[in-house]
Amino acid sequence: MENFNFSIWEVESQSKIERVDICDDESSYGYEPQCDLFLKEPDRFSTNNLVARLCGKEALHQFKKGDLVAVTLRYWRVKRNNKYVTRITIDDIKLVKELKLWL
């Protein structure tokens, strides 16, 4: 069962990762850019943070400290060692131009 959660986060920093090999099929090899985007909740009292692993075109965008991004998180449950655990993945991320548009 999947559950989606939309929220606004503030960019702390962005760190580039070496491009990694991707293989679409046995005969073609290529490279895909990746980066980690470190986010925090835009509340000065909050200690919640999030690391987004971006790939492809999203990783080429230069996010700056203080940028606000709209993030859609996908929560899903998987069975591991006879127990269900919750996994969180980022389904979508977009730069917010003006926060008032989202309130």
Question: Which stretches of residues belong to each language-model region?
Answer:
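Single-stranded nucleic acid-binding surfaces, predominantly the OB-fold ssDNA-binding core
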Residues: M1-L103
